[in-house]
From Swiss-Prot:
Zn(2+) 2 binds at C811, C885, C892, C895. Its EC number is 2.7.7.6. The lineage of its organism: Bacteria, Pseudomonadati, Pseudomonadota, Alphaproteobacteria, Rhodobacterales. It comes from Paracoccus denitrificans (strain Pd 1222). One of its GO terms (molecular function) is DNA-directed RNA polymerase activity. HAMAP family: RNApol_bact_RpoC (MF_01322). Belongs to the RNA polymerase beta' chain family. It catalyses: RNA(n) + a ribonucleoside 5'-triphosphate = RNA(n+1) + diphosphate. DNA-dependent RNA polymerase catalyzes the transcription of DNA into RNA using the four ribonucleoside triphosphates as substrates. This is DNA-directed RNA polymerase subunit beta'. It is an enzyme of class 2 (transferase). The RNAP catalytic core consists of 2 alpha, 1 beta, 1 beta' and 1 omega subunit. When a sigma factor is associated with the core the holoenzyme is formed, which can initiate transcription. Its cofactor is Mg(2+); Zn(2+). Keywords: DNA-directed RNA polymerase, Magnesium, Metal-binding, Nucleotidyltransferase, Transcription, Transferase, Zinc.
Amino acid sequence: MNQELATNPLNPLAAPRQFDEIKISLASPEEILAWSYGEVKKPETINYRTFKPERDGLFCARIFGPIKDYECLCGKYKRMKYRGLVCEKCGVEVTLQKVRRERMGHIELAAPVAHIWFLKSLPSRIGLMLDMTLRDLERILYFENYVVIEPGLTDLSYGQLLTEEEFLDAQDQYGADAFTANIGAEAIREMLANIDLAATAEQLREELKEATGELKPKKIIKRLKIVESFLESGNRPEWMVLTVIPVIPPELRPLVPLDGGRFATSDLNDLYRRVINRNNRLKRLIELRAPDIIVRNEKRMLQESVDALFDNGRRGRVITGNNKRPLKSLSDMLKGKQGRFRQNLLGKRVDFSGRSVIVTGPELKLHQCGLPKKMALELFKPFIYSRLEAKGLSSTVKQAKKLVEKERPEVWDILDEVIREHPVLLNRAPTLHRLGIQAFEPILIEGKAIQLHPLVCSAFNADFDGDQMAVHVPLSLEAQLEARVLMMSTNNVLSPANGAPIIVPSQDMVLGLYYTTMEREGMKGEGMAFTSLEEVEHALASGAVHLHARITARLPQIDENGNEVITRFETTPGRLRLGALLPKNAKAPFELVNRLLRKKDIQNVIDTVYRYCGQKESVIFCDQIMGLGFREAFRAGISFGKDDMVVPPTKWDLVEETQDQVKQFEQQYLDGLITQGEKYNKVVDAWSKCNDRVTDAMMKTISATKKDEKGAELEPNSVYMMAHSGARGSVSQMKQLGGMRGLMAKPNGEIIETPIISNFKEGLTVLEYFNSTHGARKGLSDTALKTANSGYLTRRLVDVAQDCIIREHDCGTDHAITASAAVNDGEVVSPLSERVLGRVAAEDVLVPGEDVVIVRKNELIDERKADEIEAAGVQNVRIRSALTCESDDGVCALCYGRDLARGTLVNIGEAVGIIAAQSIGEPGTQLTMRTFHIGGIAQGGQQSFIAAAQEGTVAFENESTLENANGELIVMSRNMQLHIKSATGDTLASHKLFYGSKLFVREGDAVARGQKMFEWDPYTLPIIAEKAGVAKYVDLISGISVRDETDDATGMTQKIVTDWRSAPKGNELKPEIIIVDQDGEPVRNEQGNPVTYPMSVEAILSVEDGQEIKAGDVVARIPREGAKTKDITGGLPRVAELFEARRPKDHAIIAEIDGYVRFGKDYKNKRRIAIEPADDTLEPVEYMVPKGKHIPVQEGDFVQKGDYIMDGNPAPHDILRIMGIEALADYLIDEVQDVYRLQGVKINDKHIEVIVRQMLQKIEILDSGDTTLLKGEHVDRDEFEEENAKIEAKGGRQATGEPVLLGITKASLQTRSFISAASFQETTRVLTEAAVQGKRDKLVGLKENVIVGRLIPAGTGGATARVRRIATDRDQEVIEARRAEAEAAAALIAPEDTPAEVGGED
């Protein structure tokens, strides 16, 4: 590889080699010798007196090249004229000193040595080739055991290990020549050299056909794959054992003299010295015919020293230097954050850059930034020099330099010229998304701080409390062009994550705009009428009218036809001011701002202006409202005072009331009416409710409008204005200042029962203060952890998606996914219009029930179309998606849809993968790190009923109910749903009904808003009798499977099912309650099965043995704790868990087929559940469930494919296998979105789809057909299709496979590009594997191109590559045409000549 990339040493200006791919493979000894310029024989480095390299040493000039340019070591030949000559005295070639960076040497080893990467990197490649375990290999290599290489006619077998004694005995028994056995790396080399790859592969294929069981085929496939990769790549197995070691060029492992006669050296020199020393000693020992044991020891030491050189610390103890620090080996040079890949190739330092503190620059325009003069002078030096020379102010660069250093006046004039129209890039670390680097035009300022426009702060996430930013200068014309056209801050108005404007006023500006658009009664000038804006301004200035007075005024508007019309409005002077700034457009009417504007409203205004009035107008508008906001906030003089925090007068009444309640609960607990857990829940519940009521009372007090004696409305409370407008602060912060602080959490996440009743204004008691320190500290440590975790998630996401680029306009696929509104707990959290906006329709969208097309197939759905779809009441739309795109290497534009940051169809070459990764990763720091334990936490108080949110009629789905003795309807199904339908039949809301819920409505009932529809017990899960009869206990034996719990305080006894498996003779028991009739015969259900209720551990029995029961009675209750003690993983860990596709701990079991449930014979501690398929052609499916787990299905229940047989979180792999790709994508998107929605972060679904697409790139082969693919192997989708296409062309049987879901880390490591994978994680493993397979990296992704130092194949880089490709094709055509013409001409001239000669001339 080095040779391929190295430049020609004789010609210093040789052009860099153009290459299309990089291949990595094992180096044969011959190749190593071919690279080498000589053998390093001595461990010496430099003569410390003369500082000249020792001959034949590690820095030898004869091998590696001269120390000074064009000068040999002894100084006989100097200067250019002797170039290329080899000095006969010192043997040094006269050439550039630079060749010492590229010439390699070698060491001839006296004994072969196994390469540690191929030995120890799991799975061990040498071990696989020889079919030996790693332990056996090490025994041979480190001279403990002999191995039989050629058994001859003896009873020994090939590959058998022999101890020293056994070996000697065998020699005595069979004679010394009857068999061959050897020890050490020689033995292994010999065995590897004897392998016939083709024959081995053939034999393995035969074995694979006959192999049965689970593990054997897997093992054979592993060996077969490695044997085949050796065959294909042309590598030989024995090359994994080294006989020659390359020595890297000396300039790459420098030795630098420090003052005081000491040297600073690279660790590699120490490691090489060790190898050379031991190698020379071994040579001498062999020459001296030393005893075997000594030679062996020396060989072992040589093996160890070579191991340390390649990968120190991988085997045995770490070799340390003189200061007890481990030496950095060749592997360590590549690995980790400080390794070559991540430190120097992916993260380079940049020239022409500077950094400084930022301050706010409110008088800048949006596309400008203030650059300190000093910085600009330094950054633009070369430009200034050339301009000075061009103007004749200096004749040489040296002179120009002097002028600049003295800072003469003419230099400043020139700096102004240079800087004009030359954008610079500003970057703030951490750059979490692409808006973290934007281009601005510099404006020269005095001082030393960079001025930043306030509106771009939110994109950079910058504030002015000492943040620093870096400035970079784009040098070439192309770079300046890209900076201006693509990166200018004015082009980044919309966020790529969700398409909403990101240039939005914040803080003071919001407050100013809120204050401007306020309207108050009874202000001065109320009811006046004005003819024009100028008149209003005049009146304001003279004090005749107040900013908030309600007035009537005329304002010119644009109507639908684009004509100007004067319209009258009821408004306030403040709103008129704002309205005057709106661009004149029919789509941006004055009504847009004729109301009280909060932060969200301002964002909508900007969005509307951007969509309909274009970029230029909206940028000007943003700048103007920023100015207005700052100005008005300053004039309003809104400030924050202690008295602005109002403590509600009713607070103490509410607190006392709650304290009484808590006392009652304590008493109930002492009386034994409730358990400790229930008491805890109720207390926490009560305090949360109290907290909410105090907060409501405070908000009522604080937001109430007050009037003065003249009846004029007073200004609202200033703190309320800040919070309400969205400028700063929130209700919860106000609650802590003026209400009560409320409940606090312990460090482990549990809630402390006693709340903090005081607020900050009143001051906390010592105890309260102590209780609140827990949470506060946890918050701080969480934040630190969160940042690191979030960054790591982003890194993994970027790595998995980096090669996902828009490659073509249309892939022509027929596949699509269905989009529908997202509903959570009966609430529509994101409407259909939001989910289809910016997507491409996969088929015509029609108005329901009519033949009217809203959107044509392959048409982009914009805002207007989305609203039409919503208005027409369409329920779901088939849209194209990145998941179903069929492009090779990337996605097509139609499947992706709109580029959210531009608002138009995405361009070819856009790096959508990276944008997706950034959009998901960037808000990561806002997510929580907490895992919620529901160890009885009242999460906002457990809900126990649901009331109708809309009015409509009730409709049930999968109805299965039962009337109990009191005439109440009880839900008996697990997948019954209640829908509320509108008059037109649209579903307004839908609720999942829990088993055992009581229904208050019937099918077809009309419900009003707020009407209670159904309720359930939030703390227990009931088991309900479906038939009347007598309850009979089975295997419910007191003391073995049932314990009687008597509460001391109350004397009440409950029967509770215990874990019967732990009891002696308990394993055979199947505790259940059956229902029998009066004669003791089991009552049967509709399917004819006996009615039985298996009991799970911790269930509380509600009926006695032999008690008569009616249908609908509760037989037993399972505490919800038991049914639901799983932690709810929230926030970042949940997102990571989903993208890593981890199986949840207690994952749900999902039915794979439609059929009937049967309970089979039980195992020791597992229950067997079978599903008998409804379709007779299918096989029954069996599942094992731990005994004592609650199973929600009964014998004979009909389940549908995809139903849960056991509760829990489903494993994403199961969803993919059973329900398919679309269901998996829906699940992942919904789950990820739920986490982000909780934090109020909006991310477009398509970003998650892109990542899921990348997780589904591999296919597992189920049947290999006639292809060379192996069963059970994971291959890339493209490879799979290529292989099948080849076989189809030959008419053979195609391979079949199913998609596999890989977590993002695994998917990144299994990418086709080994360079990208190696720079991500597990560098050694990736490179080892790639070398054995002789992999070629085609350089298609972004990362590999950055690493080899080319333009990335995305954006403008992709465009130039495309143009170049087209040009080459055209040239090729022209050349072909000319050749054809020439041949035709030649044929005309010499028709009697043989055609062979014509071809020869060419």
